[in-house]
From Swiss-Prot:
Assigned keywords, A-Z: Decarboxylase, Lyase, Pyrimidine biosynthesis
InterPro entries attached to this UniProt entry: Aldolase_TIM, OMPdecase, OMPdecase_AS, OMPdecase_bac, OMPdeCOase_dom, RibuloseP-bd_barrel
Role noted for this protein: Catalyzes the decarboxylation of orotidine 5'-monophosphate (OMP) to uridine 5'-monophosphate (UMP).
Species the sequence originates in: Geobacillus thermodenitrificans (strain NG80-2)
Protein family per UniProt: Belongs to the OMP decarboxylase family. Type 1 subfamily.
Name this protein carries in UniProt: Orotidine 5'-phosphate decarboxylase
A GO cellular component annotation in the UniProt record: cytosol
PANTHER family per record: OROTIDINE 5'-PHOSPHATE DECARBOXYLASE
Record pathway: Pyrimidine metabolism; UMP biosynthesis via de novo pathway; UMP from orotate: step 2/2
The organism's taxonomic lineage, starting at the top: Bacteria, Bacillati, Bacillota, Bacilli, Bacillales
One GO term of the biological process aspect: 'de novo' UMP biosynthetic process
Active-site residues, as the UniProt record annotates them: 61 (proton donor)
Record Gene3D superfamilies: Aldolase class I (3.20.20.70)
Binding site for substrate: 10, 32, 59-68, 122, 184, 193, 213-214
Complex and partners: Homodimer.
């Protein structure tokens, strides 16, 4: 895939996206399309990004019975996206079905979209895990278990906090992707995410791709913020 920086386009409409992308004209990005944008604009927004030369992570976090996920992935594969995801909590058979659907739906001669599994959302903390989700194991152990299950199910990697990337690499190997949201500059608000790190720390912890949204999309100068991201990832001292 392309750059290690995945820009989360959490906008409600195509118009808002176009306004944001204007300063990046001619610069191929790796963009994340989540539920908010995809449910409003549908497959047409994916086609627009691909025509502009951007890589696309379609972040719908599928979690359903295996056959439903298989058929959904079969359709998503035809869109030409580069990366999709499911919830690891859906279990091994569901994750295997996701890969089966992608294999069946990918056009002849095209590369199958990579598929990663969400371990635990970066808005989840130990209290929520135990008291609300009723999972007794510690957060790190739960993430590690889900990562191993995802790998055994044929996933290409996981979505995890950068704080768990080292643990996952040790258990699953260097080639197993760690895609890490919850990325903020040191002087940013953490908003609704509780497990956050800076770009430079994420790289040091073993992240392959970092997902960053509001720090770029809500910046007064998004292009300058993106340049700062590149600088910090490469060891710059602005943190």
């Amino acid at each position: 895939m392309h750059t290690p920086f995945i820009v989360a386009l959490d906008f409600p409409s195509k118009h808002d996206v176009q306004q944001f992308l204007r300063p990046f004209s001619g610069t191929p990005l790796f963009v994340k399309v989540g539920m908010e944008l995809y449910y409003q604009e549908g497959p047409a927004i994916i086609a627009m990004f691909k025509e502009q030369g951007h890589a696309v992570f379609l972040d719908l976090k599928l979690h359903d019975i295996p056959n439903t996920v298989k058929q959904a992935m079969k359709g998503l594969a035809r869109l030409g996206v580069d990366l999709v995801n499911v919830h690891a909590a859906g279990g091994r058979r569901m994750m295997e079905a996701a890969i089966e659907g992608l294999d069946a739906g990918t056009p002849s001669g095209a590369a199958r979209p990579r598929c990663i599994a969400v371990t635990q959302l970066t808005s989840t903390d130990e209290r929520m895990l135990h008291e609300e989700l009723w999972i007794s194991q510690p957060l790190e152990e739960t993430v590690s278990h889900y990562a191993a299950l995802a790998q055994a199910s044929g996933m290409d990697g996981v979505v995890c906090s950068a704080n768990e990337a080292t643990l996952i690499k040790e258990r699953c190997g260097a080639s197993f992707l760690a895609v890490t949201p919850g990325i903020r500059f040191a002087d940013d608000s953490v908003h609704d995410q509780v497990r956050v790190v800076t770009p430079r720390k994420a790289r040091a912890l073993g992240a392959d791709y970092i997902v960053i949204g509001r720090s770029i999309t809500r910046a007064a100068d998004p292009l300058a913020a993106y340049s700062r991201l590149q600088h910090e990832w490469n060891g710059g001292e602005t943190e």
